[in-house]
């Protein structure tokens, strides 16, 4: 959530930045009008309360002097009613302001490319050249079904479209991948491994910015305020909800494997086959808590942590700086890692690493006490390290052989019981 005082004092700059994120000018003008009305009403209320206090003292004096205070008492009843009415008006404006401020996205950092969508994303760097095949590479779902390691048909029978069974060496490959990812993050990158709740309340979903704006994107438990997590970012970030940390403990690194549940509202007709877009998938998440001074340094480190996984797996990828119109709601800056998918002859997102600055911390009240004993909002960061199913897809396509087998990436061989080929 944005700082209302900052919005008021820097309105033109805030308006210009939010418009690059698709926010309509009339919404921001309405915010300013409501904010001014609220401040005017607060001044009136304070003046009335001061007048009431002064007259109350006069009434007390009149009573001590055994003089008639009836008129002033009647006047104070009227003033009290006026104060109550103004308070109600202020509360109504507060609700309107909250309806606006809770749905405004974060301000983009000055380094973020300005643009309406993914077409304006900027490539930062690439790693490795895509493999040249001596045969036409098959899509991963075809490779997997021929090997009998993924079953989309029975997944659909049991749960509907966009669900899958991992089977045999397919399940082993998925498990090998997330164990490899967690080991790298914990033992080499310095993250603390967590196992989180997979169901969270509305407060947690609000804290990370999914609610109230994106309720249609998740699976909610009927007749409760509980939701299946769309990402482990939600329980990991909210671990410190409404807490004050010791600044000396920052930065704090968390990582967790969890299923992610997405309704994929608005994705009809997109990626209807394969592992790219499912309602349920495993993901290893990275979350950081930082001070303001070092959060962008931590973003670069987090992005490098995700890149190292792809490099060790030998998967070609590129890093994209997302434009203002393509970033997620809570992000101030985002890098996407896109892995090469041979059958589609294109790069597809496999990780997204974001600095949310103090946007989530304001919503979740995550603070720290600095060296001067002043309480500050923390900066929060999150990133995929990596989406496991999409990594399986990338391996099946990039490491497929002409005979239909799949070579196991060298770094995964120990995790696969020294198996070198899936066939």
Curated annotation (Swiss-Prot):
Quote the catalytic activity from the record: tRNA(Ser) + L-serine + ATP = L-seryl-tRNA(Ser) + AMP + diphosphate + H(+); tRNA(Sec) + L-serine + ATP = L-seryl-tRNA(Sec) + AMP + diphosphate + H(+)
Q: Name one Pfam family in it.
A: Seryl_tRNA_N
Binding locations of ATP: 262-264, 349-352
The principal localisation class reads cytoplasm
Q: Name one GO biological process term.
A: selenocysteine biosynthetic process
Q: What is this protein called?
A: Serine--tRNA ligase 2
Domain comment from the record reads as follows:
Consists of two distinct domains, a catalytic core and a N-terminal extension that is involved in tRNA binding.
| Annotated residues for binding of L-serine | 231-233, 285, 384
Question: EC number(s) for this protein?
Answer: 6.1.1.11
Q: Tell where it localizes.
A: Cytoplasm
Tell me, in a sentence or two, what this protein's role is: Catalyzes the attachment of serine to tRNA(Ser). Is also able to aminoacylate tRNA(Sec) with serine, to form the misacylated tRNA L-seryl-tRNA(Sec), which will be further converted into selenocysteinyl-tRNA(Sec).
A GO term from the CC aspect: cytoplasm
The entry assigns this protein to a family as follows:
Belongs to the class-II aminoacyl-tRNA synthetase family. Type-1 seryl-tRNA synthetase subfamily.
Molecular-function GO term, any one: catalytic activity, acting on a protein
Involved pathway(s): Aminoacyl-tRNA biosynthesis; selenocysteinyl-tRNA(Sec) biosynthesis; L-seryl-tRNA(Sec) from L-serine and tRNA(Sec): step 1/1
What quaternary arrangement does the UniProt entry report? Homodimer. The tRNA molecule binds across the dimer.
Protein's UniProt keywords contain Disulfide bond: no
Name the UniProt key words of this record, in alphabetical order: Aminoacyl-tRNA synthetase, ATP-binding, Cytoplasm, Ligase, Nucleotide-binding, Protein biosynthesis
